[in-house]
Amino acid sequence: MPTFELNKAIVQKAEQQQFDFALSMIKLRGFGGKTEFWDHNLESFTLMAGLAAVTSRIQIYATAATLTLPPAIVARMASTIDSISGGRFGVNLVTGWQKPEYEQMGLWPGDDYFSRRYDYLTEYVHVLRDLWDTGRSDFKGDYFTMNDCRVSPRPQQPMKVICAGQSDAGMAFSAQHADYNFCFGKGVNTPAAFAPTAARMKAAAEKAGRDVGSYVLFMVIADETDEAARAKWEHYKAGADEEALSWLTEQSQKDTRSGADTNVRQMADPTSAVNINMGTLVGSYASVARMLDEVAAVPGTEGVLLTFDDFLTGIDAFGEHIQPLMRCRDHLRVTQEVA
């Protein structure tokens, strides 16, 4: 069950192990099943406000479910957490894809939203940027109308915005408006398989005249040997919650307008559905370190978002056994030696 104390322990460990950032997702209704898959979630902004107060270096990102929160409120909450964190805060914007999350509270705008959600998000981020950059907005659009709307104090640092688009529309939005774009890794122990997605993002950003890199998501399942790590992975697959995964598949098919290459379609692929196909690195500490170096070498990759089969032990294992073997993290050793 998620608690603040658990999340605090995880993020403080991540800071101690020199992780660069921590991001919390938002889920307003899970997938059910015997495991109650994602049925229990803390609210992202209030969680990250608390974590900002008990950390000192790590960057903190909260996720805004934009159908549930007016942009002016998000702008003010973000400015508040920026103050708490000393300028370490950023916002992940999600349009929303799982209809029951929003329908349960009367906020689903209709299934035509699937085809116009990035128009909605474009107006949303325009209001955010107005308020963060100038402290006021008079934006008038199809979805939002601001009348001398104000936010003060403004953030002390430029507010970073991230998004997670893999559809053409999602990438076009990120190219125009985001600072980074998240994408899923692909497959099991195929660290460079996401390269075409990163290349599409790079091309979209170049077309927009901006530099927007990809942050790729992988799950790490590591142990002292390849065999021990593989045994864990096989154990997890054997216990897959088929009822919850069936619900996910059903919901992923509701959007018929975004094309085949989307995060949600990848999540529902049966290949590695037990961990929603986020891309998985399974192996010894040395094997995982080597594969993460391969990830970092993919053109367009700006960073990696890691999740673990067990966060508390996984973060320590990463910091103590995997990260020291990674060539792409050599700069951390140099920093430690200088200090």
UniProtKB/Swiss-Prot annotation:
HAMAP family: RutA (MF_01699). The FMN-N(5)-oxide reacts spontaneously with NADH to produce FMN. Requires the flavin reductase RutF to regenerate FMN in vivo. CDD domains: Alkanesulfonate_monoxygenase (cd01094). GO terms for biological process: alkanesulfonate catabolic process; nitrogen utilization; uracil catabolic process. This is Pyrimidine monooxygenase RutA. It comes from the Bacteria. Its EC number is 1.14.99.46. FMN binds at I26, K27, N92, E101, R117, Y118, S167.
